[in-house]
From Swiss-Prot:
This is Queuine tRNA-ribosyltransferase. It comes from the Bacteria. Keywords: Glycosyltransferase, Metal-binding, Queuosine biosynthesis, Transferase, tRNA processing, Zinc. HAMAP family: Q_tRNA_Tgt. The active site is at D93 (proton acceptor), D268 (nucleophile). Residues 249-255, 273-277 are annotated as: RNA binding. It comes from Actinobacillus pleuropneumoniae serotype 5b (strain L20). Zn(2+) binds at C306, C308, C311, H337. It catalyses: 7-aminomethyl-7-carbaguanine + guanosine(34) in tRNA = 7-aminomethyl-7-carbaguanosine(34) in tRNA + guanine. Pathway: tRNA modification; tRNA-queuosine biosynthesis. Pfam families: TGT (PF01702). One of its GO terms (molecular function) is tRNA-guanosine(34) queuine transglycosylase activity.
Amino acid sequence: MKYELKTTSGNARRGRLTFSRPKGEYVVETPAFMPVGTYGTVKGMTPEEVAATGAQILLGNTFHLWLRPGQEVMKSHGDLHGFMQWHGPILTDSGGFQVFSLGKLRKIKEEGVTFQNPISGEKIFLSPEKSMEIQYDLGSDIVMIFDECTPYPATFDYAKNSMEMSLRWAKRSRDRFDELQNPRALFGIVQGGTYEELRKISVEGLVNIGFDGYAVGGLAVGEPKEEMHRILEFTTPLLPQDKPRYLMGVGKPEDLVEGVRRGIDMFDCVMPTRNARNGHLFVSNGIVKIRNAKYKTDTTPLDPECDCYTCKNYTKAYLYHLDKCGEILGARLNTIHNLRYYQRLMAQIRQAIEEDRFDDFVVEFYAKIGKEVPPLQSEVNK
């Protein structure tokens, strides 16, 4: 993987990731949003439909694909690309966050994490080394280190111990990744909770080990938005300029804009797909809750500014009808639209950075959805 920083507008970065794959070179323009394909599918969508929304890279879940269908099935198809028939780049998470989500069903030790398989109930063990091996078999283009996602709230001591263990796990991940002679990219993950000094130590430790990119982890786990913005604004300037930066599991359209304002290049979130299935649709001036009875007779498209298949062909009344009847097509059309909304947003962001008018774009974006522009920490401190 190669990263090229092309231009900036304030702290916002316009770049390009290039991946060499068996079927040729693939380019990902950044800032980029990655749709989530937890079980090797973006729910309800074919790979061609996902690509048609403008997505250039997907996210897969190591933890879920390891438990089902397992490494052997994956290897029998070549890798995850062959299994799901998506030939572009794939980033896989390490399984750390899913294990974190199991709560009382897991036990964290220095060696790794023992937990109860949520499918079969049997005890299984996941370590940094095992995570690297699974991701190697998945053929991931971007492999994430195995870390502990520090919960919120966490005391300073808990966050410190957790971050220090994540650094030791980062080194073990790096060592096993190198032993496997994996030609792909490996990203480090910054932890440290909401404590700036811990975030700084985490960044220094990761940069010392050396990675192809850096993710900011342990955010969007329940902390207030202001806290997330503060930590992001503190952390991103510490990261190497010549490597991509990834904000994990975030989020709403506003979160993407705020992340880019603070120097983030990559995002993923289940929000556009999950919300689509619940009739919660993102449009240029905010949100349409398609289950609202006022749409029953509405013959206008979802978003007149949108060029997706759904908006070009169907009315709000039809989408309301499909949802009311529980038709699968409703969820599919909604998903096509939400994913296209996110990709259009990223394209607009990239263009604004190229034209060095990103600050103006931010003002326009918030004006459209009827919200105030949140101040940057640097502005608050003036």
